[in-house]
Design a protein with these regions (language model features):
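Extracellular/luminal Pro/Thr/Ser-rich low-complexity repeat and linker "mucin-like" segments
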Residues: 12-28, 110-112, 166-170, 291, ...
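Extracytoplasmic soluble-region selector
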Residues: 1-112, 179-183, 189, 743
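Surface-exposed loop/turn positions
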Residues: 20-25, 68-70, 161, 167, ...
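Secreted, cysteine-rich disulfide-bonded mini-domains of extracellular proteins
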Residues: 679-746
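Short glycine-aromatic motifs
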Residues: 4, 43-53, 441, 690, ...
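Low-complexity, Gly/Pro
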Residues: 6, 12-20, 27, 31, ...
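Sequence signature of WD/YWTD-type beta-propeller architectures
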Residues: 91-682, 710, 741-745
Length: 746
C-alpha cells in the first residue's frame, strides 16, 4: 500500500467492566508499508484515551466509565485516517444501595428528609432500599408472571421520553393491584449493547417510620451514579447507525413471588442542558413573607423567585426575602429573565400603595448576591412580564395583567425601553418602535437571536384578551425598530392564546391555547379551573397550529397520562367532567440554544406527578395545606420536553415530558425560564462551550481529562460557538443561534 494506513482497519469491539481500563487496543501507522510517526487523538475523552505521539503506534485505553463508539484519528500532514472502537460497558449488578456518595444522597434515614429541598435525590419518593434476601432475589430473577394480571404498569416516567445528559435520575413510579411490594429489580440496557446494569432493592426502611407519608413501596429512584453512566453512554453513534436508546425494565416482588418485567424505551440527547431555570414559587420554605398568613399547620408562607441548575437536588433563593409576619415586602414572584441569563426583572409587593405589585426592580444575575444589585425603575407599573432582549439592553413592555386580581400594569400601550448604559443604571428612555401607533402587546417575547418579537395584540381590549390575535414582527437591533408585522394565529372564538416562545432557530413558535376559562379571570391564568394546552406553528409557511400531543400526554389511542382521583381523569365531576390531565399545561418558554439536536421547552403543568404529587389540580394555595407534608404536595410543577427541529408544518415535533428535578415538593411552582448562565472566563472549568465567554470548552493543557473555557480551537464542537456550519468540527452540524448543534440519530 502506497498511502497512509492504520491497522487494525475494521471496527474493534471490546467488552469493558465498569471501572476497569482493559482490554486495550494497539494501533500502528504505516506509509508505503513502512512505520511512520503520526499524531494520535480520540474524539471522546470520556470513552478512552490514546498516546498522542507523534509515534508509529499507540495504545487506546478505555476509561471504564462510559460505553459507546470511540473514534481514533491518526494525522500525518494534511491527511487524517479514522478508526472506530465500540466499547460495551458491563455495569454489573448490585443488591441494595451502595456506599457511593451519590447513592447515599438517595437514601433516606429520617422522615424529615423526605420533604427537604427537592425531596430525596431531588425527585421525591423515599429513596433507595437496602439489600434483598436470597429467596426474594430468586423470585425477582424468575417471576411468576409478567404482571399483566396484576395490572403492573409505569406511572412515571413516560415511554419514549427524550432525556438530556447531566440530569438527576428520575423517580420510577408504578401502579398495580397489589398496592405494595417487598422488593424490586431495575434493569438498564442500551439497544446497541453499549451498556447493561441490573440492581435489586428492598423496601426502604423509612416507610416503616412514624410519620412517613405512606407505608407502601410504590416508587424508587434509579441510582444516580448508574443513571449518569447509562445516559452518558446512550445517545451516541452505533455500529449499525441506529439510535442507541435506553431501555428500563422493572420487576416487582411481593409475598415470595415476582411479577414483570414491564419496560419502557427512552431516547437520550447527546448533550447536557446547562444554565439555570428561574421560576415562581408559592409556598417555598426558603423565605417567609406573606403578612400574618400561615398554612394549616401554622407555618408562615413564602413566595420568591428560585433557581435550579442541572444537577442540583434543591432550588436556591434568587430574589425574595423573609419579611413575615409583619409585612409582605419581601415577596418577589412575577418575573422575566434575559435569555443570556444576565438580568432579571421582578415585581414587588407594596402594601402601602393603592395597588399592589406595581414597583419593578432589575437584578444582576452575574453577581454572587443578585438581591444586593436591585435597581428600582423610575416608572412603576411598566415592566411586569416585559420582553427583554438576550443581553437585557432593551425591553418591550407588556399590557396584560398577570391576573385579574394582580394589577401590575398601569400602561395600555407598549413601548421599547432602553435601560441605560450599563443596564441597571435605572435611566429609562422610551424609544420609537416602528410598530403601529398605540399597540398594546400582551405576553411579548423576543426570539433568542433578537431578530423577532412575538406578542398577542391586545390593543384597546383593556384586561380581557379573549379573541386577541398573535403577531410576529421583525426587529432590527441596529436601529431598534420593528417591521413586517404579521398575524400568525387567531384563537378560536371565545378563547385566549398567549405566552408565545420562539424555537432557538426561529423556525417556529410555541404558545399556550386556552381550552376552558375558569369563568372569573379575563386573562390567562393557571388556577381555579383554567385549562390549557401547548401548541406550536411553523413560521415561514402558511401557519398551521398543532397541539403538541406528545408533550401534553396524548398518544395514538388517547391520553397516556396516569389517571387518578381528585379530578385527575378517573372520577371527574361537575365542571371537570370530560376533562383529563392533557389540558393542564401552561406558560411555555424555550431554552435559547439547541442541545443534543433538540429544542427544550419548560412549562407549568398541574398533571399528576406519578403517585408522588396527587392532590386536586387547583389545590396549590399555600394556606390550604401543610407545607411540610409531602403527601399534600400540590401538582403545580415545572416540566420539560424535547422538541424536534426542522419538523414539517402541521406535524407534532414534541416528545413526552419529564418532571424538572430539584423543585420543592410542597410548593406550587410555575413560569420557568431556562436561560444561559453568565459566561465563564478562559481557564474556568466548563462542561460545554455555551458556558464560556469566548465560546469554547476544550481540554485543559495541564490536565487533558478536564475541560476549561478557551479562546482557541481548531474547530467547534457541539455547543461551541460558530458563525456558519463550516465552523463546526462535524460537517453534519448546524449553526443555530451562534452554536454548533448536532442532529439526533434517527
Amino acid at each position: 500500500m502506497n498511502g497512509l494506513d492504520i491497522e487494525p482497519a475494521g471496527l474493534q469491539t471490546i467488552m469493558v467492566t465498569l471501572g476497569q481500563n482493559t482490554p486495550t487496543i494497539a494501533y500502528t501507522a504505516t506509509l508505503a508499508g513502512q512505520p511512520v510517526s503520526v499524531a494520535w487523538s480520540v474524539d471522546r475523552g470520556d470513552l478512552g484515551s490514546a498516546v498522542a505521539g507523534p509515534a508509529s503506534s499507540t495504545i487506546v485505553t478505555p476509561t471504564g466509565g462510559t460505553g459507546g463508539m470511540l473514534t481514533v484519528s491518526a494525522r500525518l500532514g494534511t491527511t487524517t485516517i479514522k478508526r472506530q472502537v465500540f466499547i460495551q460497558l458491563d455495569g454489573g449488578t448490585q443488591n441494595g444501595a451502595s456506599m457511593n456518595p451519590l447513592e447515599q444522597q438517595q437514601t433516606a434515614t429520617t422522615v424529615a428528609q423526605l420533604g427537604q429541598g427537592g425531596g430525596i435525590g431531588g425527585v421525591g419518593g423515599e429513596g433507595l432500599g437496602g439489600a434483598v434476601d436470597a429467596s426474594t432475589l430468586t423470585a425477582l430473577a424468575t417471576p411468576a408472571g409478567n404482571g399483566s394480571v396484576q395490572m403492573l404498569s409505569f406511572l412515571y416516567p413516560y415511554d419514549a421520553t427524550v432525556w438530556p445528559r447531566g440530569m438527576l435520575a428520575p423517580l420510577l413510579m408504578w401502579n398495580w393491584s397489589q398496592g405494595d411490594a417487598d422488593a424490586i429489580q431495575i434493569e438498564l440496557l442500551t439497544t446497541s449493547g453499549s451498556y447493561h446494569w441490573k440492581g435489586t432493592f428492598a423496601k426502604p426502611a423509612v416507610l416503616g417510620m412514624t410519620g412517613a407519608p405512606t407505608t407502601k413501596f410504590i416508587r424508587s429512584p434509579i441510582p444516580q451514579d448508574v443513571w449518569a453512566t447509562a445516559t452518558n453512554t446512550a445517545g451516541g453513534s452505533t455500529p449499525n447507525g441506529k439510535p442507541d436508546q435506553l431501555t428500563v425494565k422493572l420487576t416487582v416482588a411481593i409475598g415470595g413471588q415476582g411479577f414483570g418485567p414491564v419496560s419502557q424505551t427512552w431516547s437520550v440527547a447527546a448533550a447536557r442542558l446547562t444554565g439555570t431555570v428561574y421560576y415562581n414559587s408559592y409556598g417555598t420554605q426558603l423565605v417567609q413573607n406573606w403578612s400574618n398568613i400561615q398554612d394549616t399547620a401554622g407555618h408562615y408562607i413564602g413566595a420568591a423567585i428560585l433557581g435550579i441548575r442541572s444537577g442540583d437536588t434543591g432550588p436556591h433563593l434568587v430574589v425574595g426575602a423573609t419579611s413575615a409576619p409583619t409585612d409582605d415586602s419581601g415577596c418577589r414572584v412575577c418575573h422575566v429573565v434575559s435569555s443570556r441569563g444576565r438580568y432579571l426583572i421582578a415585581q414587588a409587593e407594596q402594601p402601602a400603595a393603592p395597588n399592589l405589585d406595581v414597583t419593578s426592580f432589575l437584578y444582576d444575575l452575574n453577581d454572587a448576591n443578585p438581591q444586593a444589585t436591585a435597581t428600582q425603575f423610575t416608572t412603576n407599573g411598566t415592566f411586569a412580564w416585559a420582553a427583554m432582549l438576550s443581553d437585557a439592553s432593551y425591553a418591550y413592555t407588556n399590557v396584560i395583567e398577570p391576573s385579574s386580581t394582580n394589577p401590575a400594569i398601569s400602561a395600555t400601550t407598549s413601548a421599547l425601553y432602553a435601560f441605560g448604559a450599563p443596564p441597571g443604571s435605572g435611566v429609562l428612555a422610551a424609544i420609537s418602535t416602528g410598530l403601529p401607533t398605540g399597540v398594546g402587546a400582551g405576553y411579548p417575547s423576543f426570539a433568542p437571536d433578537d431578530q423577532y418579537l412575538a406578542y398577542v395584540d391586545a390593543t384597546g381590549t383593556g384586561t380581557n384578551t379573549q379573541n386577541c390575535p398573535m403577531n410576529v414582527a421583525a426587529y432590527d437591533a441596529a436601529t431598534q425598530t420593528f417591521s413586517n408585522v404579521k398575524t400568525i394565529y387567531t384563537p378560536p372564538m371565545g378563547t385566549r392564546a398567549g405566552y408565545p416562545a420562539f424555537l432557538p432557530d426561529d423556525s417556529g413558535v410555541l404558545f399556550e391555547q386556552e381550552v376552558r376559562n375558569n369563568g372569573s379571570d379575563t386573562v390567562m391564568v393557571t388556577r381555579s379551573g383554567e385549562r390549557s394546552q401547548i401548541e406550536w406553528l411553523k413560521l415561514g409557511v402558511s401557519p398551521m397550529p398543532v397541539v403538541l400531543r406528545n408533550l401534553v400526554g396524548i398518544g395514538a389511542s388517547g391520553s397516556y397520562l396516569p389517571t387518578g382521583g381528585n379530578q385527575h381523569g378517573l372520577d371527574n365531576t361537575g365542571i371537570e367532567a370530560g376533562y383529563d390531565d392533557t389540558t393542564l399545561d401552561y406558560e411555555p418558554t424555550v431554552l435559547p440554544i439547541v442541545a443534543g439536536g433538540y429544542a427544550w421547552v419548560v412549562f407549568t403543568s398541574r398533571r399528576l406527578y406519578g403517585n408522588q404529587c396527587v392532590t386536586e389540580p387547583w389545590a396549590s394555595v399555600p394556606t390550604a395545606y401543610n407545607l411540610a407534608d409531602p403527601s399534600q404536595a400540590p401538582t403545580k410543577k415545572l416540566w420539560v420536553a424535547a422538541i424536534d427541529l426542522n419538523a414539517p408544518a402541521g406535524s407534532d415535533p414534541s416528545h413526552p415530558a419529564f418532571y424538572l428535578p430539584a423543585q420543592e415538593l410542597d410548593a406550587g411552582n410555575s413560569r420557568g425560564f431556562w436561560v444561559l448562565d453568565p459566561c465563564k472566563t478562559d481557564g474556568t472549568s466548563c462542561a460545554s462551550g455555551d458556558q464560556c465567554c469566548n465560546g469554547y470548552c476544550q481540554p485543559d493543557p495541564t490536565m487533558p481529562a478536564s475541560l476549561v473555557c478557551s479562546n482557541t480551537a481548531m474547530c467547534s464542537n457541539v455547543q461551541e460557538k460558530c458563525t456558519t456550519p463550516a465552523d463546526c468540527c462535524d460537517t453534519t452540524n448546524t449553526c443555530t443561534n451562534g452554536f454548533c448543534a448536532g442532529i439526533p440519530i434517527q
